[in-house]
Amino acid sequence: MIMRITWGKLRAGTWNEYEQAYHATITGKAIPGLRGRWLAQDVNDPDGGFSVSLWDTLEAMQAYEQSAVFKQEIQPTLQPFFAGEYTTYRCDVKYEQ
């Protein structure tokens, strides 16, 4: 199982608009291998947050990252909200409860 964690800093004061765009862009898309996805706002920095997704395999996650949906719909819609600080981590899940 693979976890994809993206941390980003949004342009000041744009969280609500970003959250609406995220929900509108992500909802209803059937993505092979995707087990679940979460969007979390930092409680100490309202302009910072995390997108976390859980995948069956590394290959499924990589296929998503290379897909037309990701490159042509999701990224172009969400990227303009970021203030330049944006990092994605890809993790092999070692423990689950």
Label the model's feature ranges.
Residues 1-50, 54-69, 76, 80-97:
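Short S/T/G/P-rich N-terminal loop/turn motif that feeds into the first structured element of a domain
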